[in-house]
């Protein structure tokens, strides 16, 4: 069987691009998916439209699919979905063993390069099913946990949490001892509206433009304690495939996203810092555990001014918002609300911001001007997708995340009393796209209309 399959794939990959038939590519794609499945290679971000493995989808693309009403818009949607499939499938293929009986990583890459354009060209948008992205909540947990009752009982604790986090913004902040700064951009960033001249009016910077944007708006990270677990670092995998944080190489992991607000598609810049642990504050600390982090997101208006910032930890916890635009008013939100920063924050288009973290908890307690007098170390920017294909000491490739989008080693004790709220393994670190940000109600960090939910 393997010999027949390998012969078919070898024949397929030997054909020139113009000679590939639809059925050849469909057969090759099916064989690749089966090879990945047999190898136990999965990725929660690599979702595809059912029946169309060459079309990658996420919450944003599912939203855009409904917005694509003209032929040019529909054609652009297919291109975007195909580009996502290329990204996802090539990352999955990197994790195939070199001695795989069906596909090597190189063979899989060649198949994708040859066949994705063929399959995209023959896709009829009108026949596609609407993309449905499952939410990150487990309904059965809420049913088993008598959610209506437990959500009501949790109201007091949620209110206490809001008061505690708001108080941290007002109380005297710890004095920073060291800060980590991004590289200075070599070129001025492009305004999002200059790269949104396409049928769907989405800001789509090219790689060089995106890098300039990421560098320009990147924050300085200030820490008040320099013990190892309070220092950001590069994520690496050890011999046991367990993640370790290399603090000798400070890094922020970046990705772009989009939100829809007031009739426009807005560009968002995401920055993720990783720490080795949240240490215990006493033996009953249910929030402590291996790995911790911070995600800082910058939402840009079409002219490049900042509309607002928001932040979470990689568990999806501690959602906080930091308005910049004076016209923003917090909406009446159902369920538990994000914590609102009590002061207006400066626009990172005009000045670099510093994020001051509380020691050990890594709570963000201040957003301030940069202190030029502090000892400063540089950090580098890395594509967050590299976390989905990390090199291992034995030469193979693995992922930080499991098939469900979680980092299992980061599980927290809080999962034992928060499970009735429907968030699987509450407190564990999660992959982008899996960040549930509310215990009461259902809300996700990557919802396409989250800005419209947050603000009037």
Residue map of PLM features:
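Positively charged n-region of N-terminal signal peptides that target proteins for export
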Residues: 1-6
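Bacterial N-terminal signal peptides
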Residues: 7-16
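Boundary at the C-terminal end of the N-terminal hydrophobic targeting segment
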Residues: 19-21
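Domain-length functional cores that host ligand/cofactor binding and catalytic or interaction surfaces
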Residues: 23-188, 290-292, 303-456
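Charged, compositionally biased non-catalytic regions
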Residues: 177-246
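Glycine-centered secondary-structure boundary/capping sites
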Residues: 218-219, 265, 441
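Short N-terminal edge-element motif at the start of the domain
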Residues: 228-309
């Amino acid at each position: 069987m393997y010999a027949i399959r390998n012969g078919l794939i070898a024949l397929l990959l030997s054909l020139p691009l113009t000679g590939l038939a639809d059925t050849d590519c469909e057969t090759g794609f099916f064989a690749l998916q089966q090879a990945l499945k047999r190898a136990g290679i999965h990725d929660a971000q690599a979702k595809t439209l059912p029946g169309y493995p060459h079309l990658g989808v996420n919450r944003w693309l599912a939203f855009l699919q409904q917005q694509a009403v003209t032929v040019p818009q529909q054609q652009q949607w297919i291109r975007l979905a195909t580009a996502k499939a290329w990204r996802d499938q090539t990352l999955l293929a990197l994790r195939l063993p070199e001695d795989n009986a069906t596909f090597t990583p190189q063979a899989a890459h060649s198949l994708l390069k040859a066949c994705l354009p063929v399959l995209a060209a023959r896709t009829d948008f009108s026949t596609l099913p609407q993309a449905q992205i499952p939410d990150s909540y487990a309904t059965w947990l809420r049913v088993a946990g008598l959610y209506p009752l437990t959500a009501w009982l949790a109201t007091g604790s949620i209110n206490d949490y809001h008061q505690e986090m708001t108080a941290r913004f007002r109380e005297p902040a710890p004095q920073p001892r060291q800060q980590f700064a991004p590289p200075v951009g070599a070129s001025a960033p492009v305004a999002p509206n200059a790269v949104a001249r396409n049928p769907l009016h989405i800001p789509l910077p090219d790689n060089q433009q995106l890098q300039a944007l990421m560098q320009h708006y990147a924050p300085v990270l200030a820490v008040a304690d320099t013990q190892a677990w309070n220092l950001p670092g590069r994520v690496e995998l050890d011999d046991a495939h367990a993640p370790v944080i290399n603090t000798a190489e400070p890094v922020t992991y970046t990705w772009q996203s989009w939100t829809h607000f007031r009739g426009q598609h807005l560009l968002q810049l995401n920055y993720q810092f990783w720490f080795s642990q949240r240490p215990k504050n006493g033996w009953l600390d249910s929030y402590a555990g291996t790995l911790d982090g911070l995600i800082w997101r910058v939402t840009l208006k079409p002219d490049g001014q900042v509309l607002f910032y928001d932040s979470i930890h990689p568990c999806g916890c501690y959602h906080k918002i930091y308005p910049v635009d004076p016209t923003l008013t917090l909406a009446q939100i159902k369920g538990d609300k994000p914590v609102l920063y009590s002061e207006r924050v400066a626009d990172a288009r005009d000045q670099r911001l510093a994020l001051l973290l509380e020691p050990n908890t890594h709570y963000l307690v201040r957003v301030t001007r940069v202190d030029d007098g502090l000892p400063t170390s540089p950090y580098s920017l890395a594509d967050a997708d590299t976390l989905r294909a990390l090199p291992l000491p034995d030469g193979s490739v693995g992922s930080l995340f499991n098939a469900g989008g979680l980092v299992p080693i980061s599980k927290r004790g809080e999962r034992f009393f928060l499970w009735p709220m429907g968030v699987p393994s509450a407190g564990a670190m999660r992959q982008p796209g899996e960040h549930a940000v509310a215990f009461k109600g259902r809300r996700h960090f990557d919802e396409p209309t989250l800005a419209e939910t947050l603000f009037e």
